[in-house]
Design a protein with these regions (language model features):
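Thiamine diphosphate
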Residues: 109-314, 322-324
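Outer-membrane beta-barrel domain signature, strongest for Gram-negative TonB-dependent receptors
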Residues: 76, 95, 99-111, 118-119
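Ubiquitous "structural anchor" signal
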Residues: 43, 79, 104, 185, ...
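Glycine-rich ThDP/TPP pyrophosphate-binding loop and its adjacent helix/strand module
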Residues: 1-98, 281-336
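Conserved phosphate/pyrophosphate-binding and hydrolysis machinery centered on Walker-type P-loop NTPases
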Residues: 82, 102, 175
Length: 336
């Protein structure tokens, strides 16, 4: 591995990606130094000649040769630099080893949720701004509607109140989602804040993590609850562990919207109805919301968005599909 050539090519790749907004792949040859673990005895399956050849390609030694060949450093300079680094690492290791250990469950769990709060408090949208955004719908806001419509209204308000929110997912843009929950959002707020994603749940949650790292509060949609399980490790292994592993220094907030649970009559298929909630209850620090009616859904959606913005919380918001378009909630013609 030629580190100088790698640096040059990486800078070129970065410039290309920024200019043309295209992905860039770096194709390089690497070597495998030493075994995978202490029990991996390389001499059991590789000859001494093979091991020696690999060691001669050690990037550290190769880089040292480049520096000497180009008269950047002498061998004694490189040895001194190596020894200084070794001593510094040893000193830091000794210091880290002497630090107090975590002694109880409270200490261990203290950073599952970050204690850092966002002090910026977005103002509630003014009525004149709401009237402009909602247009003809403004005069209908006080009427009773099913859950899907009420959530749509709530998302309009959230996008107005929190300028750092973005909404994305499969067909959530111009189409407005399968159940029109995101209808007119792209028209009213533009394609930079409301946009379609690839048909890939891993990418959707990966995008969300990246947005969260950069000061946004993403509100992604996973089209059906069963689809989440294709990408659950993005949340379990990456997103939800960030605060814990960084000692509360970093967060990547998000509000993941997922329709699921009991389905509309006549629609089947395990890829839509495999509704396991156990995965969410097994992830420390995650907020799981599941409203039973449209009015509660609006209040809860506002509340969890505030938690995500202020405290960097990770939220999974499950909507009952069977209630999305229901008007008579408890009894026939009750219009609740």
């Amino acid at each position: 591995l030629d580190l100088i050539d790698l640096h040059i090519k990486t800078v070129q790749a970065e410039q290309y990606a920024r200019k043309y907004r295209h992905p860039v792949f770096l194709h390089m040859k690497t070597v495998r130094l030493m075994g995978h673990a202490g029990s991996d005895i390389e001499t059991g399956y590789m000859s001494l000649e093979e091991l020696s050849k690999i060691e001669r390609q050690d990037p550290l030694l190769f880089s040292a040769r480049i520096l000497m060949d180009n008269k950047c450093l002498r061998s004694s300079d490189i040895n001194n630099l190596y020894e200084e680094c070794r001593k510094r690492v040893s000193k830091i290791f000794e210091y880290a080893s002497s630090r107090p250990k975590l002694i109880d469950s409270d200490e261990i769990m203290s950073t599952i949720v970050s204690n850092v709060s966002n002090t910026i408090k977005p103002e509630i949208p003014k009525q004149i701004d709401r009237k402009k955004i909602f247009g003809k719908e403004y005069s209908r806001l006080d009427k009773k509607y099913h859950m899907a419509k009420l959530i749509n209204y709530a998302l309009h308000d959230i996008l107005m109140q929190y300028p750092n929110t973005v909404i994305f997912g499969e067909d959530v843009g111009k189409k407005g989602g399968v159940y029109h929950v995101t209808a007119d959002l792209q028209k009213n707020f533009g394609s930079r804040r409301v946009f379609d994603s690839p048909l890939d749940e891993t990418s959707i949650l990966g995008f969300s993590s990246g947005f969260g790292h950069n000061g946004f509060v993403p509100i992604p949609e996973i089209q059906f609850l069963a689809y989440f399980h294709n990408a659950e490790d993005q949340i379990r292994g990456e997103v939800a562990t960030l605060s814990f592993f960084s000692k509360g220094q970093f967060t990547n907030p998000m509000v993941i919207r997922i329709p699921g649970l009991a389905y509309q009559k006549g629609f089947g298929g395990h890829f839509h109805n495999d509704n396991s909630l156990a995965i969410f209850r097994d992830i420390p620090g995650l907020i799981l919301a599941c409203p039973s009616n449209g009015s509660d859904a609006v209040k809860m959606l506002r509340a969890v968005t505030k938690e995500a913005h202020k405290k960097g919380r990770i939220v999974v918001f499950i909507f009952f599909l069977c209630l999305f378009l229901v008007i008579d909630l408890h009894n026939p013609k009750d219009n609740k």
